[in-house]
């Protein structure tokens, strides 16, 4: 009787062990399937499979990498809030300093992409002040440069990249963009002389039109006062001359801002499509 009981428990143990082994193989297959979907750029399918794995698997073996790849999938789909959520979960499930660093860096990159750059700067400072990552200062500075790019501070971006390498490709690009930008305040002040602000922003036709209207209404206003037509002079001066004079100032500043936007968008388009280095 005792031998029968022993055999029963031995068989039960073997069955349980076999069941666990099959389950482990099943989870490994599920993870590999999800990872393959991610590599094939089927991001939403990958997210579904990773989440299915995390729901059924009670261990921690797949938690870090699954959450990291879910975050990267959401990032590719421009679902930035969801991406940050899963990068944060990846950090919580990290087991090495390298994993902590990678997950935090991904959160920073997403903040750069969605232009919450102040948050990115705060996280970069936190990362830089962490003694565990003292040897990562150059890479941290690299992403700080990108944060300056996305906050439209091309001058500081150029300075930041040049700290890494004097003739860094991105330093040269950012410096070129910064030198090519118009100064909206200068355009505004130049427009005290009608048309000068437009000439500064290469809007020559607009500048000539502005000069023409201001000369015309200025002449008519002054002429009205000289002929003692005070009411006419006031009406022409306030309703027409002042309107065109103030419009000339506003237009010059607007042209500078619009052209700067075109230039920065063109630079960002180049960086996105033609720059071969690391990007957020």
Task: List the predicted regions and their residue ranges.
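Short solvent-exposed coil/turn linkers within tandem alpha-helical repeat scaffolds
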Residues: 54-63, 91-102, 128-137, 162-171, ...
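Alpha-helical segment of the N-proximal tetratricopeptide repeat
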Residues: 25-56, 76
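Hydrophobic alpha-helical membrane segments
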Residues: 65, 79, 99-102, 109, ...
